Amino acid sequence: MRAVRAETRARELFRDAAFPASDSSLFYNLSTPLAQFREDITWRRPQDICATPQLFPDNPWEGQVKQGLLGDCWFLCACAALQKSRHLLDQVFPPGQPGWSDQEYQGFFTCRIWQFGHWEEVTIDDRLPCLAGRLCFSRCQREDVFWLPLLEKAYAKVHGSYEHLWAGQVADALVDLTGSLAERWSLKDIRKASGQQDRPSGGEHRACQQLLRLKDQCLLSCSVLSPRAGARELGEFHAFIISDLQELRSQTGQGILLLRIHNPWGRRCWQGLWREGGEGWNQVEPAKESELLAQLQEGEFWVEEEEFLREFDEVTIGYPVTEAGHLQSLYTEKVLCHTRALPGAWVTGQSAGGCRNNSCFPCNPKFWLRLLEPSEVCVAVLQRPRRRLVGQTRALAGASPAPVNLPGKDYQAVGLHIWKVEKRKISLPRVLSAPPVAGTACHAYDREIHLRCELSPGYYLAVPSTFLKDVPGQFLLRVFSTGKISLSAVRLATKGASPGAALPAGEWETVQLQGSWRAGQTAGGSRNFASYPCNPCLPFSVPEGAGPRYIRITLQQHCRLSDSQLHPIGFHVFQVPADGEKQDACSLLLQEPLLSCVPHCYAQEVSRLCLLSAGNYRIVPSTYLPDTEGTFTVTIATRIDRQSIHSQEMLGQLLQEVSFMAVMKA
């Protein structure tokens, strides 16, 4: 934020060069209906849209979400969760920022978005997309309130463009805006489990009763995945907000459960029995009808339980977050006040073992989970989306629109299983051949999957997996518990000679090089990632001699996370061509390495003894995952082959010259 203020001093109002007011911020590949408005969209600041812009209104309803031309109802439904808890809104939209009437106003705002385990600050200018002088994407019920379109712009910046927000999951946006967990209940699956296809089952009724209990604590959303005959007004692939639930009695004494649904489109699209003037109201007293209809705001309507279960496909529920930032259980209302998280990865040919149907399932990443007391535990696996190709505006040159990207395209089918073990030293085949104490019902193409269980004290082995083997990916394992826990990765055994193994006898010249991995700068991760060339590239040379020389290269990390956790590290060595002294590091690192010390191992140090010819080389040390910070030392020991000399003064005994450099003996 300090850098932004410095830039604004040289200009009248801040202009965000990283997310400019241009087509590159609006579109990804012109694959959505948004493309037809390309020539008509202009950018305006709030003070150019209305006379007295404000961030938040005094009346909460005036700040309610309303959808525009962009198909991001999933994101807007999640935004409604922020209005239920002021501390959540303050977390995402830090208070105290200068507004349009303040002297300190400089044309920018800062939001916080939760991304892969961390809250990231996202600063934007306040130029917003408009059509005919009005906001064309999200807006609040009162159009001079701007917290929502500004947050939408920040979220679009995180994703790369507004068009990237077309279609998504409410659950994903809820996690990004709260840092918590979200559950998706398939109403169709609940009905299948009960064996009743024609009418609501006991399981569905219990689900609605649970929604009634949770209505004041967390965001409730419902979605239509395909339209039904006679109810096409709900649309297809559209998300709604469940604003309220009311349990009442009919005039004959029967129980009735009504759900108040808010359509982000901002219009009442429901023509069911409980619409205004509908037949359903004949079942209740006129006074009750008037009371409930008076509660409806723009875009809201009442639906009875049976209609709701018939017409909607899915319900999404966000876990409540306390003011202290702890999750609260949806099932017991207990506070999950102990949290741990660790990153991991599935590496093709190494740790991407696939599901339990595959013989290489034991190769998957494994984690130790220790509980110190009986606890309610939620364990989640959050996938990092595969990065889209760089150059997102390539399709803007006049190419025909590409097919709309479908939700889930960027994610693998992922599952999670947990085994109880007696101690940390185990027979892995024996443990994995037994039934797990907890596991996901199936592998799902969701960004995040999780399971909830009651666990007794002791050690547990958690194994996240993709359904298919040799499918690469990164993930974050998150654990939330009512009791004290510890979480650590199972270390991979380092193959080959140990790092501290003795060198062959003789004289060795040693050189030590210091370096560091810095997120966003020099922490590029392994060669599986496009950011690999960002890693430190350390030069060394082998002098001319009678032939190839023995070289021992040792990489030692100084980035221990705890007594039981180390980063996975490794290195590659590249030979510089004789005519390639001026070759840049990036192009050199795109070639095949001459030798490698991989797979990356959870070890304090790793090393490789090799024979190298005279020439120039580059060592590239790396952690497996990008943006993993730490410092390291690379030690290069070169064998010096010196000829023995005879000395008459020593009566024919052999002497060796003593180098001023370090002498290392076996």
UniProtKB/Swiss-Prot annotation:
Key word Protein biosynthesis present: no
InterPro entries assigned: C2_III, Calpain_cysteine_protease, Calpain_domain_III, Calpain_III, Calpain_III_sf, Papain-like_cys_pep_sf, Pept_cys_AS, Peptidase_C2_calpain_cat
Subcellular compartments: Cytoplasm; Nucleus
Statement: the UniProt record of this protein carries the keyword Repeat: yes
Region (Domain III 1): 322-488
Biological process terms in GO annotation: autophagy of mitochondrion; cellular response to insulin stimulus; mitochondrion organization; positive regulation of apoptotic process; positive regulation of D-glucose import; positive regulation of insulin secretion; positive regulation of intracellular transport; positive regulation of type B pancreatic cell apoptotic process
Keyword terms of this UniProt record: Cytoplasm, Hydrolase, Nucleus, Protease, Repeat, Thiol protease
Tissue expr: Ubiquitous.
Region of interest (Domain III 2), ranges: 507-648
Positions of the Calpain catalytic domain: 13-321
Lineage: superkingdom: Eukaryota
Database matches in Gene3D superfamilies: 2.60.120.380, Cysteine proteinases
Sample GO molecular function, one term: SNARE binding
Matches recorded under PROSITE patterns: CALPAIN_CAT, THIOL_PROTEASE_CYS
EC assignment: 3.4.22.-
Catalytic site positions: 73, 238, 263
GO-annotated cellular components: cytoplasm; cytoskeleton; cytosol; membrane; mitochondrial inner membrane; mitochondrial matrix; mitochondrial outer membrane; mitochondrion
Free-text function comment from the UniProt entry: Calcium-regulated non-lysosomal thiol-protease which catalyzes limited proteolysis of substrates involved in cytoskeletal remodeling and signal transduction. May play a role in insulin-stimulated glucose uptake.
Family designation: Belongs to the peptidase C2 family.
Name of this chain's protein: Calpain-10
Gene from which the chain derives: Capn10
